[in-house]
Amino acid sequence: MKKTLATLFLLTCLGSSSAYADNALILQTDFSLKDGAVSAMKGVAFGVDHNLKIFDLTHEIPPYNIWEGAYRLYQTASYWPQGSVFVSVVDPGVGTDRKSVVLKTKSGQYFVSPDNGTLTLVAQTLGIDSVREIDEKANRLKGSEKSYTFHGRDVYAYTGARLASGAITFEQVGPELPAKVVELSYQKAKATKGEVKGNIPILDIQYGNVWSNISDELLNQAEIKLNDTLCVTISEGSQQKYAGKMPYVASFGDVPEGQPMVYLNSLLNVSVALNMDNFAQKHQVASGADWNIDVKKCAK
């Protein structure tokens, strides 16, 4: 009897821990908050389960910018627990024959999205466990069948909420697909002695800092160390946009105000900034799959 009660207690504890993670629904869109689109999505999710925990990742993705949507998922996903469900709606192809999918990562999170490149970076960094196509006959908001332009509300928020609340299992999302997604092409980060190259996936928008996909591990492989003077080149495609020298430092206050610097951002990736100024604005630098950066030790 005591053993049975102990087992039930343990299962209850495990169940409530799992339920908390499974009930996390995280929304990302390019809708902004200027109108009622995001509220409609939340209303649909709340209608599925009044106890659902709904969070916002961001709704300020620039319109149609699939690449930035991909990066924001990568930036945040690893900090959310197993069982969390992300709904990402950056969908310029809404209403076309592009697939609507749910990707389960090897770390146990779920991503509900059009298969249009949005899942590129989470697939590459967290790994793909499996992918399922959303069966819209089973997983679509009732009464929305005539709507072709708001799948974020009618399909993605609805399916994400059903999955997060436990109303459906992952297997009930729809048929399993090959374990791959549409991937955007970009410059993969790489290192050689004294030099690293990579992509500029995003800007630290508030401050104008330039973030790369070059990890601190690659910097170590290149034998680049704190206080080295580095030559930095930034290009858009084949067109050079910036070239200059700057120190590699730990933080902003290590250089005078207005001076350039290389540092590691909060994701431990190589970044470029001006202390208390806007590097991207001053040098007309942007981000995306076509924006690349080269950082190397300057010749003495």
Question: Where do the language-model regions lie?
Answer:
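Mid-to-C-terminal functional-domain signal that highlights helix-capping/loop sites
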Residues: 283, 292-293
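Active-site histidine-anchored catalytic micro-motif
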Residues: 24, 36, 48-54, 65-71, ...
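Anionic-ligand-binding alpha/beta catalytic cores of soluble enzymes and soluble regulatory domains
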Residues: 144-226
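N-terminal glycine-rich anion-binding loop in soluble enzyme alpha/beta folds
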Residues: 22-60
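A conserved acidic, glycine/proline-rich C-terminal tail/linker
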Residues: 210-284
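Sec/Tat signal peptide C-region and signal peptidase I cleavage site
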Residues: 17-21
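Sec-dependent N-terminal signal peptides
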Residues: 4-14
